[in-house]
């Protein structure tokens, strides 16, 4: 009985830890605008993967070209 309870708590703890981890592009969703298809612009890269398509560039980024639907290609400032 105690082994079943410990196993349940272990599985619950692992599940809780995994749910807390953001995956892929979800970490930056507060800076994104959804496309009509449901995809988020922050997930798309531009300039050979060196920039991100955003509606507005962050303070530590500079605009470098444009993406579709009036989005800017934002690259980190050097």
Curated annotation (Swiss-Prot):
The UniProt record lists the keyword Secreted: yes
Compartment(s): Secreted
One Pfam family linked to the record: Defensin_beta_2
Family per similarity comment: Belongs to the beta-defensin family.
Chief place of localization: secreted
Species, as recorded: Macaca fascicularis (Crab-eating macaque)
Keyword annotations from UniProtKB, A to Z: Antibiotic, Antimicrobial, Defensin, Disulfide bond, Secreted, Signal
Name of this protein: Beta-defensin 105A
A single GO cellular-component term on record: extracellular region
Job description of the protein: Has antimicrobial activity.
Signal peptide: 1-27
An annotated GO BP: defense response to bacterium
Disulfide bonds: 43-74, 53-67, 57-73
